[in-house]
């Protein structure tokens, strides 16, 4: 599930109970703040809700992986994933728990979408 903006707690709970891996892409909105394309007063509630949802997903142990939507407006190739990781750490702190959680989500994606060897 990419982006997943505007989910509520019930949806996050259902996500945690499923095998779905959520790739939030926080920086697609966060990086727009202050650039003038949209008013910050519009962006800030969206950013806050995304951060709250990430925190809830972490608490409920939903499967989550990093992704940046690189190439989107203000999400530069090469830096987007670093920006996304920084956004995750600003919400959840810098911990082994975060690293393990992200690794589990990434491994779930790799396992499900593994190409068969010929």
PLM features: what roles do these ranges have?
Residues 38, 48-118:
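His/Asp/Glu-enriched, well-ordered alpha-helical/loop segment
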């Amino acid at each position: 599930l990419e982006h997943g903006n505007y989910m509520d707690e019930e949806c996050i709970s259902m996500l945690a109970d499923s095998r779905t891996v959520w790739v939030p892409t926080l920086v697609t909105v966060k990086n727009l703040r202050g650039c003038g394309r949209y008013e910050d007063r519009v962006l800030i509630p969206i950013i806050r809700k995304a951060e709250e949802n990430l925190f809830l997903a972490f608490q409920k142990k939903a499967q989550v992986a990093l992704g940046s939507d690189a190439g989107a407006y203000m999400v530069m190739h090469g830096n987007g994933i670093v920006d996304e990781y920084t956004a995750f750490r600003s919400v959840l702190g810098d911990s082994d728990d975060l690293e393990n959680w992200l690794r589990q989500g990434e491994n779930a994606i790799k396992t499900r979408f593994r190409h068969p060897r010929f």
